[in-house]
């Protein structure tokens, strides 16, 4: 490629990221698009582009202060790049900050800092110094994925991160060179403006009063939570939907304004995290409406000096002024589209507004009426783009929503647009006329007139398919339009507008159409077409790959198309010379080469390009099996799409890697390549050449970018480009006349409408209507009606109509023959019915179509089998469910649940359904019982050993025994009457000693056993009553039979009372199905029918025999009631017979009858009362369970407090270590600061000593100048500035600039003109150096003072945190101690159940003398009735709650199963994707390609063995050499050791002699050195004096020379003498 001399470059890029548009300076807007950053100058309209060469751009940010742009690439371990504007110089690369991708990046406004946030999987917030490319600090937060990141413009130490569920303010704290991030989460209010109830640390309050409910516990302890979950737990009933932040911005007071998805605006203090909901003054009193400022979602905000700009889904830009918690709407501007983002320019005079449809407006803040639309680009994924005609002026693009837009090829400006409001699926531009064809998902083709580029329009619509159009292709000369779809039909249309885009016909291919390619030849007057097809069904299995189907379209077809098609519109294969070719590899894309003698394809399985040559055999017929003659490397990621240049010399390859490769077809080598799109988004979607080959336009997959490429001008590539240009010019000249004619015809065509289309159809006399489509600017798709038929369907109807007319006579003859044949067969069937059985024929003998009958029979059998299988499966599932329910609710029950109902009153008493006690329960009960016995024996023994028994006299023994008997018999302290109903309470603990947890649990086990015994006793009584009722019903039935006989004899017709058992009394009925319950007639086989008839006859015989006179039975009925012996229990039952007066109304009863009725009711009522006898034992269990529950809550709270204490202690240790470490750093830095201040003071004090060689007057003058400092002018903000943030804090750059200004001012002060009188120049120069040194020290002191103050503030915060941690630990310790005391008090304050006499009510005596003036005396039966009603309603409510709970559980179970299946589906998809992307290594390829792989491996092993042997020999030689060298070195070391010992001895002697000589010198040479020093000082003074005199003389000479220079300069000035005219 380097030798080709050709290179591509980006001409322009179009597309916009709607949420990332911002200013980089006052007149330049920038935004990311694909893997480009686009910069647009709003003044000149010029474009510039910055490309991300490593992939698609991810996060994006701009610093207007430094005019730099930062963006991240999308790859593994991404990098953040920082570039300058407009030079695009790389300033920094920030690496190792994320693993997968950066979600957000943001610049600080003044300081050289950048914040980045990476989401999954690390969730890390990192602060960078982008100028030095180093990370300063980072913090991980794995619980939240944030969506917005901003720095505080007034304080770079603060930044804010927000997501849809949370908002966090981060503080950057600095201590010298160490940085730390501290998070301050903000508690968001609910949507109605209230905040959730926060869980407080409720301290247990000590109290002397006994509380039945125990100490007050927080909700988390009641829920049983311990740990971090308890800190954030809020009960479900107290939870409220909080606001959802969507965007935030800072104001000038360092507060935050937050816009929410529900239309609320919040004001948050960054220091205190206090949240205020802003509301308008004039809103209604409704609290919810007051908290909602805008209808719909607030998507973006921007703060200005005049107020807050807010925009969102409503498409209106609002300006609010805020005062306190109230806002006022000042102004608004309607964009008529949902607004996605807004951004101010650095001067805050212009606001950029980006809408969801891709429009970019520039809003003038001072003059809103001057707002104009800067851009109008695609808002969705691009479908395709192509050049109009020659391709040197305009190109046309379409997105998937049917939005058509025209662009200028020269500069990329948007010319016009047209919204079709359809789902576009394909697009192509005609090379011979200025129009485009767009295919839709409904199978329609829309023809767009672009002659007037400023106003494109729809001129015609044609429906060809019932499925979406997938392919559209024009031949190179614009004569034919070819379309393809999934139904395997290729339609050929006349592409000339003068013929109204006439449909010429269609062909059907053998499979799915992959690509279409054509080649026109002016010599042969025909067009070669090739379709790449993927066969389906059997053909695919036979061929195993793709096929090439080629056919020819002669130009003569345009004038007489009917000669080439049949009556149904299908082309004849012989007329178009259709032929198919098989290729050796499956292809994804293919194009025809020059003269259609070669085919180029891109493999579907590999990233290779293949060249096929079409040959002919000896007989002259073409070879249908093609083998690749040349294979070259394609793109990096496949598969790819191929596109030929118009002059057929180049081929462009575009794949998923996003790179455009241009190859020379002569040698298949790459001429040029350029990265246009990112492989992360899917690479390139479409590519097109201009007619002269000078431009290429590409669209990306899912990145919304439209890229136009051009060739770089160079001498080496001019010849190739010239050939393409010449071909384009020649083709344009040949098509110019036709183009002019067709454009005129296109201009004459009216605008297409649905009404005009329908009228046109009616004029042609057709009986089908057209589709009604509303092509407006709204986002609505057309509704396809049933009458909107396709072209092929109309052709079929016309052909059928012609065939019907042509063969009408033949059809009539056939119909007449069929009628005669039917009559003959019917006569034969009637004759067959009259024949004897032996001569009759079967019915099927008269069936003429046995095959159809057999088919129908088989279909019916299949359907019956399917239905039978479904019914069997359904029955099987129901049987399984029945068995499960029966096992759980019936078989496992030792005592089945049932009831007994009174005959007349409706009273119903239920027994206790009981399961068998498990061995574990019995073992547990036995263990507790043995424990009780052991404790009783132990207590008895201890009492005998320890206690002294008092002596009891004989007179007192009887009293003691009586008291013991009373205590044993009394059940008051036991708390129930369970021992009267089968329960043994002798083994229970006393209620007054239940303190420990184990005792309470053992008591519950014993009480459960007592309840079990009570239930068993009750069930026995219940069974007795049930048997009595059965006997009573049997007796009544016998009586009824006798009464029935008497009534028959007396001819009476009265209804008798026939008592029966209800379903609750006989629950086993639910397990069987009675024949009466089956509503469908039972199917019986012939054998079963015969058996049923026999049984019916037997029953009838029995009934007739029973009707005969039976004297014995009648005698028994008359004398003894139908029995031979009257049993005793029957007599007892007869004591309370059923009253006969129940048939009368209650008003007719006598007093005696009422008395009898009450006695009759008593029995059932007693049974119902016995049911409540065990409730007292259950009350005791509930009390114990309640105490255990409270104790569990206390233990949970204690465990949580212990967890918090442990956590706080660890944090306290950490804070203590941090304080200790930073305190030492601060002390060390303070020491260095004090030293620097001391040095600075020493400079001040030593000034006069340094200039002691001059007079005191001169020293004073110099000292004043020494203290003088120049004034540095500062740039102040203008009073009329619209910037809301004013003067921001100084940055490091500003400080450096101020130092530079100071030094520049010092240079002016150091000039010789400022030398005081009498001071010599050398002294002045020395003074200037001293003053500069003093200033440098002062600046260092200032810097260190600021750093020290910052470090001290940091240390104070850490000390404050450490103290707060200590205080928290003390508070929690105190709360824990109080809670333990409360626990002990609660364990000792027992709840005891006493048994009171029935009918007594205990009242609290609040006064000394109780007053009963307002009291009412009620009978206990009233209260009992009320209680029974309440209890019944409570049971109903509990039943409904249980049913609701079970239903919710079922929903949750289904949701979990759904999620499980979804996850399994995702796992399977991932496995499938991994299998499809399985990488085949080079070794596998060698193994597969090598025929004798074992021989190859043996040869390699032999070579390796020889190599190893050679290396071993060489290694042995090297070892010997190294051993020899080592031996020599050891000998040399020994010699050196001996020499060093000798030198040590000499050194000791030299040291002794040196010390002796030094001592002599110190004694003798002091006086000589003093005299010598004085003499040297004197000579220095003399020399200095001479130098001063010389400097004065030279200064005088310089002064004289300067005066002479000034005099000579004045002579050279021109003399301007006023002249008179």
UniProtKB/Swiss-Prot annotation:
Return the InterPro entries for the record: WD40/YVTN_repeat-like_dom_sf, WD40_repeat_dom_sf, WD40_rpt
**What biological processes does GO assign it?**
cilium assembly; epithelial cilium movement involved in extracellular fluid movement; regulation of cilium beat frequency; sperm axoneme assembly
What this chain does, per the entry, is described as: Involved in the regulation of the beating frequency of motile cilia in multiciliated cells of the larval epidermis.
Per its UniProt record, what SMART domains does this chain match? WD40
| Protein location | Cytoplasm, Cytoskeleton, Cilium axoneme
Q: What is its main location?
A: cytoplasm
This protein's GO cellular component annotations are: axoneme; extracellular region
Family listed? Belongs to the CFAP43 family.
Please provide the record's keywords in A-Z order.
Cell projection, Coiled coil, Cytoplasm, Cytoskeleton, Repeat, WD repeat
Q: Where are the WD repeats?
A: 97-138, 141-180, 293-330, 334-373, 377-417, 464-503, 634-673, 679-721
Top-level taxonomic group: Eukaryota
* Residue ranges of coiled coil: 792-812, 850-870, 1026-1046, 1098-1118, 1150-1177, 1362-1389, 1451-1514, 1591-1611
According to UniProt, the name of this protein is: Cilia- and flagella-associated protein 43
Asked if the keyword Transcription regulation belongs to this entry, the reply reads no
Q: What happens biologically when this protein's gene is inactivated, per the record? A: Morpholino knockdown of the protein results in embryos with impaired function of motile cilia of the larval epidermis and majority of embryos develop edema around the heart.
Q: What is the protein's species of origin?
A: Xenopus laevis (African clawed frog)
Gene3D superfamilies on file: YVTN repeat-like/Quinoprotein amine dehydrogenase
């Amino acid at each position: 490629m380097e030798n080709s001399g050709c290179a591509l470059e980006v001409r322009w890029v179009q597309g916009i990221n709607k949420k990332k548009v911002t200013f980089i300076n006052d007149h330049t807007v920038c935004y990311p698009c694909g893997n480009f950053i686009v910069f647009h100058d709003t003044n000149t309209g010029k474009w510039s582009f910055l490309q991300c060469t490593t992939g698609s751009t991810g996060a994006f940010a701009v610093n207007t202060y430094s005019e730099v742009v930062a963006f991240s690439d999308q790859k593994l371990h991404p990098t953040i790049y920082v570039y300058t504007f407009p030079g695009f110089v790389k300033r920094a690369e920030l690496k190792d900050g994320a693993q997968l991708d950066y979600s957000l990046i943001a610049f600080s406004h003044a300081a050289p800092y950048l914040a980045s946030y990476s989401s999954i999987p690390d969730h890390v917030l990192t602060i960078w110094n982008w100028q030095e490319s180093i990370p300063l600090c980072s913090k991980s937060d794995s619980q939240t994925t944030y969506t917005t990141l901003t720095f505080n413009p007034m304080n770079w130490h603060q930044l804010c991160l927000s997501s849809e569920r949370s908002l966090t303010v981060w503080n950057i704290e600095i201590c010298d060179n160490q940085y730390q991030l501290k998070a301050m989460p903000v508690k968001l209010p609910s949507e109605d403006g209230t905040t959730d109830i926060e869980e407080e640390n409720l301290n247990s309050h000590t109290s002397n009063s006994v509380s039945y409910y125990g100490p007050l516990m927080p909700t988390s302890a009641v829920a049983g939570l311990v740990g971090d979950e308890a800190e954030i737990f809020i009960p479900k009933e107290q939870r409220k939907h909080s606001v959802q932040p969507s965007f935030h911005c800072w104001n000038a007071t360092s507060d935050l304004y937050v816009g929410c998805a529900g239309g609320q605006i919040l004001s948050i203090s960054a220091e205190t995290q206090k949240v205020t909901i802003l509301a308008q003054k004039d809103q209604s009193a409704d609290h919810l409406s007051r908290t909602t400022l805008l209808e719909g979602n607030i998507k973006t905000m921007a703060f200005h000096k005049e107020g807050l700009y807010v925009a969102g889904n409503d498409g209106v830009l609002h300006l609010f002024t805020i005062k306190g918690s109230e806002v006022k709407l000042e102004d608004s501007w309607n964009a008529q589209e949902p607004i996605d983002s807004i951004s101010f320019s650095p001067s805050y005079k212009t606001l950029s507004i980006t809408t969801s449809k891709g429009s970019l407006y520039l809003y003038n803040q001072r003059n809103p009426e001057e707002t104009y639309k800067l851009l109008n680009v695609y808002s969705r994924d691009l479908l395709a783009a192509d050049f109009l005609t020659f391709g040197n002026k305009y190109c046309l693009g379409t997105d998937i929503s049917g939005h058509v837009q025209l662009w200028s090829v020269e500069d990329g400006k948007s010319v016009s647009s047209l919204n079709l409001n359809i789902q576009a699926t394909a697009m192509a531009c005609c090379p011979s006329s200025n129009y485009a064809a767009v295919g839709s998902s409904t199978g329609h083709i829309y023809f767009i007139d672009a002659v007037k580029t400023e106003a494109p329009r729809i001129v015609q619509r044609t429906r060809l398919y019932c499925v979406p159009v997938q392919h559209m292709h024009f031949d190179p000369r614009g004569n034919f339009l070819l379309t393809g779809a999934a139904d395997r039909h290729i339609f050929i249309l006349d592409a000339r507008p003068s013929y109204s885009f006439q449909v010429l016909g269609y062909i059907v291919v053998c499979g799915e159409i992959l690509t279409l390619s054509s080649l026109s030849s002016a010599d042969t007057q025909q067009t070669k077409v090739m379709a790449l097809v993927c066969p389906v069904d059997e053909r695919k299995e036979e061929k195993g790959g793709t096929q090439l189907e080629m056919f020819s379209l002669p130009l003569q077809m345009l004038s007489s198309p009917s000669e080439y098609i049949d009556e149904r519109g299908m082309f004849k294969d012989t007329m178009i010379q259709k032929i198919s070719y098989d290729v050796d590899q499956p292809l994804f894309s293919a194009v025809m080469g020059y003269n259609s003698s070669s085919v180029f394809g891109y493999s579907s399985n590999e990233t290779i390009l293949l060249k096929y040559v079409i040959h002919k055999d000896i007989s002259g017929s073409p070879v249908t099996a093609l083998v690749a003659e040349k294979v070259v490397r394609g793109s990096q990621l496949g598969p790819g799409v191929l596109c030929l240049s118009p002059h057929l010399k180049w081929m462009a390859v575009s794949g998923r890697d996003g790179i455009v490769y241009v190859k020379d077809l002569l040698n298949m080598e790459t001429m040029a390549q350029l990265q246009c799109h990112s492989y992360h988004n899917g690479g390139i979607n479409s590519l097109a050449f201009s007619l002269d080959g000078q431009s290429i336009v590409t669209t990306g997959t899912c990145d919304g970018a439209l890229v136009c490429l051009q060739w770089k001008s160079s001498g080496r590539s001019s010849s190739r480009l010239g050939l393409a240009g010449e071909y384009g010019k020649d083709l344009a000249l040949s098509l110019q006349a036709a183009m002019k004619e067709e454009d005129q015809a296109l201009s004459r065509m009216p605008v297409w409408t649905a009404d005009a289309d329908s009228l046109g159809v009616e004029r042609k006399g057709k009986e089908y209507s057209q589709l009604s489509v509303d092509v407006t600017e709204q986002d609505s798709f057309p509704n396809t009606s049933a009458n909107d038929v396709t072209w092929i369907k109309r052709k079929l109807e016309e052909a059928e109509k012609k065939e019907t007319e042509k063969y009408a006579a033949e059809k009539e003859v056939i119909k007449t023959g069929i009628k005669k044949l039917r009559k003959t067969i019917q006569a034969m069937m009637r004759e067959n019915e009259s024949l004897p059985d032996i001569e009759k024929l079967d019915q099927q003998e008269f069936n003429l179509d046995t095959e159809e009958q057999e088919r129908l029979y088989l279909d019916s059998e299949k359907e019956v089998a399917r239905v039978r299988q479904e019914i069997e499966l359904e029955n099987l599932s129901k049987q399984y469910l029945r068995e499960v329910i029966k096992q759980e609710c019936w078989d496992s029950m030792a005592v089945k649940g049932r009831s007994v109902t009174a005959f007349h009153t409706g009273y119903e008493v239920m027994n206790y359904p009981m399961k068998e006690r498990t061995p574990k329960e019995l073992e547990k009960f036995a263990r507790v019982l043995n424990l009780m016995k052991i404790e009783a024996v132990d207590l008895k023994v201890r009492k005998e050993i320890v206690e002294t028994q008092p002596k009891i006299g004989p007179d007192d023994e009887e009293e003691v025994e009586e008291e013991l008997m009373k205590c044993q018999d009394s059940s008051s302290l036991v708390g129930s009457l369970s021992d009267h109903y089968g329960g043994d309470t002798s083994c229970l603990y006393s209620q007054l000693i239940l303190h420990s947890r184990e005792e309470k649990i053992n008591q519950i086990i014993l009480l459960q056993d007592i309840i079990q015994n009570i239930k068993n006793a009750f069930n026995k009584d219940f069974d007795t009553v049930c048997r009595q009722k059965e006997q009573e019903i049997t007796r009544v039935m016998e009586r009824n039979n006798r009464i029935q006989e008497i009534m028959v004899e007396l001819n009476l017709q009265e209804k008798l009372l026939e008592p029966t058992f209800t379903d609750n009394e006989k629950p086993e009925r639910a397990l069987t199905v009675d024949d009466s319950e089956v509503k469908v007639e039972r199917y019986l086989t012939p054998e079963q029918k015969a058996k049923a008839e026999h049984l019916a006859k037997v029953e009838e015989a029995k009934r007739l025999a029973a009707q005969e006179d039976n004297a014995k039975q009648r005698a028994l009925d008359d004398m003894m009631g139908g029995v031979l012996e009257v049993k005793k229990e029957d007599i007892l039952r007869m004591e309370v017979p059923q009253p006969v007066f129940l048939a009368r109304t209650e008003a007719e009863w006598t007093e005696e009858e009422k008395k009898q009725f009450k006695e009759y009711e008593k029995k059932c009522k007693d049974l119902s009362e016995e049911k409540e006898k065990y409730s007292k034992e259950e009350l005791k269990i509930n009390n114990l369970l309640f105490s255990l529950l409270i104790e569990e809550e206390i233990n949970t709270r204690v465990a949580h407090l212990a967890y918090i204490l442990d956590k706080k202690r660890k944090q306290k240790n950490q804070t203590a270590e941090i304080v200790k470490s930073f305190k030492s750093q601060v002390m060390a830095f303070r020491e260095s600061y004090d030293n620097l201040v001391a040095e600075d003071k020493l400079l001040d004090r030593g000034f006069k000593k340094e200039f002691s060689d001059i007079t005191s007057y001169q020293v004073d003058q110099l000292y004043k100048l020494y203290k003088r400092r120049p004034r540095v002018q500062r740039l102040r903000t203008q009073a009329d500035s619209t910037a809301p943030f004013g003067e921001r804090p100084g940055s490091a750059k500003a400080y450096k600039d101020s130092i530079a200004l100071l030094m520049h001012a010092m240079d002016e002060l150091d000039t010789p003109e400022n030398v005081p009188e009498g001071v010599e120049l050398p002294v002045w120069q020395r003074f200037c150096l001293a003053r500069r040194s003093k200033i440098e020290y002062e600046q260092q002191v200032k810097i260190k003072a600021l750093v020290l103050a910052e470090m001290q503030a940091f240390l104070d915060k850490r000390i404050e945190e450490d103290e707060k941690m200590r205080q928290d630990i003390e508070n929690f310790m105190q709360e824990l101690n109080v809670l333990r005391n409360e626990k002990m008090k609660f364990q000792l304050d027992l709840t005891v159940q006493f048994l009171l006499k029935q009918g007594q009510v205990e009242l609290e005596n609040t006064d000394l003398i109780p007053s009963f003036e307002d009291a009412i005396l009620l009978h206990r039966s009233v209260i009992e009735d009320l209680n029974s009603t309440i209890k019944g309603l409570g049971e109903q409510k509990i039943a409904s709650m249980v049913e609701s709970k079970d239903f919710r559980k079922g929903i949750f179970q289904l949701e979990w199963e759904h999620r499980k299946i979804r996850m399994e589906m995702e796992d399977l998809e991932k496995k499938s994707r991994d299998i499809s992307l399985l990488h085949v290594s080079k070794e596998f390829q060698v193994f597969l390609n090598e025929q004798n792989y074992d021989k190859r491996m043996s040869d390699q092993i032999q070579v390796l063995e020889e190599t190893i042997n050679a290396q071993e020999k060489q290694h042995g030689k090297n070892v010997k050499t190294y051993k020899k060298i080592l031996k020599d070195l050891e000998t040399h070391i020994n010699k050196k050791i001996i020499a060093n010992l000798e030198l040590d001895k000499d050194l000791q002697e030299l040291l002794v002699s040196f010390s002796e000589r030094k001592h002599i010198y110190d004694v003798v040479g002091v006086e000589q050195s003093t005299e010598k020093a004085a003499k040297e000082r004197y000579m220095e003074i003399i020399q200095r004096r001479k130098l001063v005199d010389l400097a004065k003389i030279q200064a005088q000479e310089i002064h004289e020379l300067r005066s002479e220079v000034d005099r000579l300069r004045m002579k050279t000035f021109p003399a301007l003498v006023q002249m008179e005219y």
